[in-house]
Regions:
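Flexible, membrane-facing loop/turn or short amphipathic-helix motifs
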Residues: 41-49, 77-89, 116-129, 159-169, ...
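Residue-level detector of the transmembrane beta-barrel scaffold of outer-membrane proteins
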Residues: 154, 218, 232-236
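Short, hydrophobic/aromatic-rich segments at coil-to-beta transitions
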Residues: 69, 107-110, 148-154, 200-207
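Extended terminal
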Residues: 22, 191-198, 208-210, 224-229, ...
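N-terminal beta-strand/beta-hairpin edge segment
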Residues: 14-146
Length: 287
């Protein structure tokens, strides 16, 4: 198992991600396999020299089912770019499970956290977000007896609050599929996005549901990247109680539509965002 772990670390290094820890221990054999990494770090070889640091990372796999790995992390998680801290993630508890398929590749991931808080830098400003409970579930979509390149996702957040959206905490739930999302497992950054775009990758949003006080929003749709690397596609938004949101975004003319449930298509086409028939903004290229 030790040699397999070293091979995985070497494989990651070949992809430009370098894993290390100050003190690594292995125990539990022959009943289970336990790995503990104190002061874990992963550094990217990209131009920004991005680096993530974690106080402790532990993983356990039972000997009768080594394909299922249970992971526990002790924070904080600190992220750096160009030697500057850009994000700080803390939590009361954070647990994860990772399932490996017969080819020893990951095919299913679940992440569950309680009392999670995030501080991050955006355009020179510090922002804060928090959630009392969050879940992330990913899996390669099964097709018959095999696995496709599509990644299905489900995300939940309870008690979500942020400085950018003052007021009651929100409940968020979303499900969907990233077609050809497997490329993001083996590639990174612009290379992953461009490979995904050329493969005609698409994000299929089955449902995004946001509830916050008297406000309720449901979003469905499909998005991709066009030849100019700009977002293209359409999402349909329906909701109620959104008067304050429209006014804060300079769209007070739409607040009168709140007598009944609002239903509006957001169309991303030819480099522009359209709200129904109205051109709202010019879209930038993502890379």
């Amino acid at each position: 198992f030790r040699s397999r772990l070293e091979a995985m670390i070497a494989d990651e290094a070949g992809k430009g991600r370098f894993w290390s820890c100050d003190d690594r221990k292995m125990a539990g054999y022959p009943f289970r396999i336990e790995i503990e990494c104190i002061h874990a770090r992963v550094k990217d070889s990209d131009a920004s020299q991005s680096e993530a640091r974690l106080s402790r990372l532990g993983a356990v796999a039972q000997i009768y089912d080594p394909s299922l790995i249970i992971i526990e992390a002790q924070g904080p998680l600190v992220v750096f770019s160009n030697n500057q801290q850009i994000a700080l993630l803390e939590w009361r508890s954070l647990r994860s499970s990772l399932h490996m398929n017969g080819n020893k590749d990951p095919d299913r991931l679940s992440l569950v956290g309680d009392d999670v808080s995030l501080q991050f830098q955006l355009r020179g400003q510090t922002h804060n977000m928090a959630t009392t409970h969050g879940e992330l579930h990913l899996r390669l979509k099964p097709v018959g007896e095999t696995l496709s390149d599509d990644v299905e996702f489900a995300i939940k957040a309870a008690g979500l609050s942020a400085e950018m959206m003052p007021g009651p905490a929100a409940q968020v739930e979303t499900t969907g599929t990233i077609e050809h999302g497997k490329y993001f497992l083996n590639l990174k950054g612009q290379e992953a996005l461009e490979t995904w775009r050329q493969a005609k990758g698409r994000v299929q949003l089955d449902l995004l549901k946001i509830s916050r006080g008297e406000q309720n929003v449901d979003v469905t749709g499909s998005l991709a990247l066009d030849d100019q690397r700009k977002i293209s596609g359409q999402i349909d938004v329906s909701g109620k109680g959104l008067d304050d949101v429209f006014k804060s975004q300079g769209l007070s003319k739409l607040s009168g539509l709140q007598a009944s449930n609002l239903k509006v298509p957001l169309i991303f086409t030819k480099g522009f965002l359209l709200l129904g028939p109205f051109k709202v903004a010019e879209l930038p290229s993502l890379y």
